[in-house]
Amino acid sequence: MAAVQLLAEEGADAAALSALAQRWGLCHDADAVLALVLTPQRLELRKLDEPKLGAIFVDFVGGTLAHRRRFGGGRGEAVAKAVGIKGGYLPDVVDATAGLGRDAFVLASLGCRVRMLERHPAVAALLDDGLQRGYADAEIGPWLRERLTLLHASSIEALATLTPRPEVVYLDPMFPHRQKSALVKKDMRVFQALVGADDDADALLAPARRLATKRVVVKRPDYAPPLAGVATPNATLTKSHRFDIYAPLA
């Protein structure tokens, strides 16, 4: 797990940074090239040795997610089709690899209740910061509080014990990019520097299939092999990804 510096910008609440570190079990490492930076507006992740990559933060209120919510494909989005949204059916979903919460937010904006699991404390802190700002927003706060929640836990452990059982478990494990690093999106380069590869991702499929009551959906790059080497004939395809769909295990 990558080390981080914990920094507060001028005008930010230094006491809030200390409370955040205590809550998420984060320790300041002065030699780390990654930093969690509390600004007066939000919590950000920065790669100090590559400042041109910019800052990573979770924003459910504005930016690309707001645009996607207002003008995106809605129920026609591939992730919506993959989890089975249809008519009045809005499945209860566990996103076991929440990351920056983008797909989870899309599903919540369409009406699903989504529980996000995130094991990395720095990522969980970023997600929670974004959630709290989203909960406080007059437009999306009322439904966001009802539909999108965060659990800081190891997915492998949580999938064995989580109650109530969800209808759908969604998995989007980190997979090495095929492109040269310069072509990988800047935000993903910063994010990957923090979390590394999901080396234990294959171990998620079986417990996910035991927990879900309807289906497990695994998002993969189009060139990636199936998770855990388990092929399935059922998939929703996009130009660059596929959503492999698995039946539950009895």
Curated annotation (Swiss-Prot):
<keyword id="KW-0698">rRNA processing</keyword>
<keyword id="KW-0963">Cytoplasm</keyword>
<comment type="function">
    <text>Specifically methylates the guanosine in position 1516 of 16S rRNA.</text>
</comment>
<comment type="similarity">
    <text>Belongs to the methyltransferase superfamily. RsmJ family.</text>
</comment>
<keyword id="KW-0949">S-adenosyl-L-methionine</keyword>
<feature type="binding site">
    <location>
        <begin position="154"/>
        <end position="155"/>
    </location>
    <ligand>
        <name>S-adenosyl-L-methionine</name>
    </ligand>
</feature>
<dbReference type="GO" id="GO:0008990">
    <property type="term" value="F:rRNA (guanine-N2-)-methyltransferase activity"/>
</dbReference>
<feature type="binding site">
    <location>
        <begin position="118"/>
        <end position="119"/>
    </location>
    <ligand>
        <name>S-adenosyl-L-methionine</name>
    </ligand>
</feature>
<dbReference type="GO" id="GO:0005737">
    <property type="term" value="C:cytoplasm"/>
</dbReference>
<keyword id="KW-0808">Transferase</keyword>
<feature type="binding site">
    <location>
        <begin position="102"/>
        <end position="103"/>
    </location>
    <ligand>
        <name>S-adenosyl-L-methionine</name>
    </ligand>
</feature>
<dbReference type="InterPro" id="IPR029063">
    <property type="entry name" value="SAM-dependent_MTases_sf"/>
</dbReference>
<dbReference type="InterPro" id="IPR007536">
    <property type="entry name" value="16SrRNA_methylTrfase_J"/>
</dbReference>
<dbReference type="Pfam" id="PF04445">
    <property type="entry name" value="SAM_MT"/>
</dbReference>
<protein>
    <recommendedName>
        <fullName>Ribosomal RNA small subunit methyltransferase J</fullName>
        <ecNumber>2.1.1.242</ecNumber>
    </recommendedName>
</protein>
<feature type="binding site">
    <location>
        <position position="172"/>
    </location>
    <ligand>
        <name>S-adenosyl-L-methionine</name>
    </ligand>
</feature>
<keyword id="KW-0489">Methyltransferase</keyword>
